[in-house]
């Protein structure tokens, strides 16, 4: 105590020295506000809920401008143009006052009616509203959320923030490109549109400017032209249903022709092709019963052997060059000549021997001709069945129908 009294009685304790000591002391550090990232997420979610009506209004405007429902978009465009062109200045002021007073009146009535509701009804409205529940969950989420859930909420917010900033940066970069004339075409269009709007505002009344702007927004986008093209195609289909049927049939025929070309063998055909595939195609191309019977009587489809005399090309050239013969007549002539050759080469009697086992043909042992090589065999030696498509037939039925061949031809065709 003595020492303290002595110190106080010294020259340092003079009243004139006290302010100097106080002024020399450093100020106490103020406590800085801590940054809480989860509070930022909470505020963002609340703001998102409060701004939802504006988001819904924007979605409705985009829905109309994209012509998702063409009738509503057309009626909206026409209605706005009529309003812009018919309302005068007084009507516009009246409409503005109405747009301000109606929401105010609705909010006031809602608040007045809410005060008269019982407590149970207020609680029911509070806890059965989806958005109120979401807001309540957001407010209480910090207390009940675990650490992983909180981290997930923060990550979701950061992802949305990054996407928003990326869009904003892209918009700013696009604006700078236009202002710095990096793309002369876009910049000239932008400045030309601005000059055109200034001229329109100077030359035309405001109502006409608004009507032109509204028509440009509705009728100048790509969705409007898409809807017009769809309706035009639908109208053409209704006006010409036969054309559509013909187009479907032609597409089906083209598809069948493409499959036939894929199934056909690449081997070149001679001037007059007597292969089994060509004979079957001729039968399918000409459904005349007379020529079908002529082919079915023989039950044979043969190839030209090496020592056989080929058909002279003059007949084929004559048939092709003669303009008075139709395609059906050409096919009839080819089938008739083929049938006659088969009848001359393979008689209908059962005399002779089997080329495989040398057995004599009789009433009990019928002769059978190989559909590939054309030689005569007994029923035992010519009992192998192969599909007609393996011999070059390109018809769709050739994949299912089978013909009888000998053992050697079966080995050759099976490879």
UniProtKB/Swiss-Prot annotation:
It holds the Pfam family FYVE. InterPro entries: Protrudin, Znf_FYVE, Znf_FYVE-rel, Znf_FYVE_PHD, Znf_RING/FYVE/PHD. Residues 275-365 are annotated as: Necessary for interaction with KIF5A. A zinc finger (FYVE-type) spans 348-414. Residues 290-296 are annotated as: Necessary for interaction with VAPA. Residues 51-64 are annotated as: Necessary for interaction with RAB11A and function in neurite outgrowth. Residues 1-92 are annotated as: Sufficient for homooligomerization. Residues 1-210 are annotated as: Sufficient for localization to endoplasmic reticulum tubular network and for interactions with REEP1, REEP5, ATL1, ATL2, ATL3 and SPAST. It is found in: Recycling endosome membrane; Endoplasmic reticulum membrane; Cell projection, Growth cone membrane. Residues 1-24, 254-290 are annotated as: Disordered. The gene is Zfyve27. Coiled coil: none annotated. This is Protrudin. Can form homooligomers (monomers, dimers and tetramers). Interacts with RAB11A (GDP-bound form); regulates RAB11A. Interacts with FKBP8; may negatively regulate ZFYVE27 phosphorylation. Isoform 1 interacts to a greater extent than isoform 2 with VAPB (via MSP domain). Isoform 1 interacts to a greater extent than isoform 2 with VAPA (via MSP domain). Interaction with VAPA may regulate ZFYVE27 retention in the endoplasmic reticulum and its function in cell projections formation. Interacts with ATL2, ATL3, SPAST and RTN3. Interacts with REEP1, REEP5 and ATL1. Keywords: Cell membrane, Cell projection, Endoplasmic reticulum, Endosome, Membrane, Metal-binding, Phosphoprotein, Transmembrane, Transmembrane helix, Zinc, Zinc-finger. It is a multi-pass membrane protein. One of its GO terms (biological process) is positive regulation of axon extension. Astrocytes express both isoform 1 and isoform 2 and oligodendrocytes express only isoform 2 (at protein level). Isoform 1 is expressed specifically in the central nervous system and selectively in neuronal cells. Isoform 2 is expressed in cerebrum, cerebellum, spinal cord, heart, thymus, spleen, intestine and lung. Phosphorylated. Phosphorylation is induced by NGF through the MAPK/ERK pathway and modulates interaction with RAB11A. One of its GO terms (cellular component) is endoplasmic reticulum membrane. GO terms for molecular function: identical protein binding; zinc ion binding. The chain crosses the membrane at residues 67-87, 89-109. Residues 88 are lumenal. PANTHER family: PROTRUDIN. Residues 193-213 dip into the membrane without crossing it. Key regulator of RAB11-dependent vesicular trafficking during neurite extension through polarized membrane transport. Promotes axonal elongation and contributes to the establishment of neuronal cell polarity. Involved in nerve growth factor-induced neurite formation in VAPA-dependent manner. Contributes to both the formation and stabilization of the tubular ER network. Involved in ER morphogenesis by regulating the sheet-to-tubule balance and possibly the density of tubule interconnections. It comes from Mus musculus.
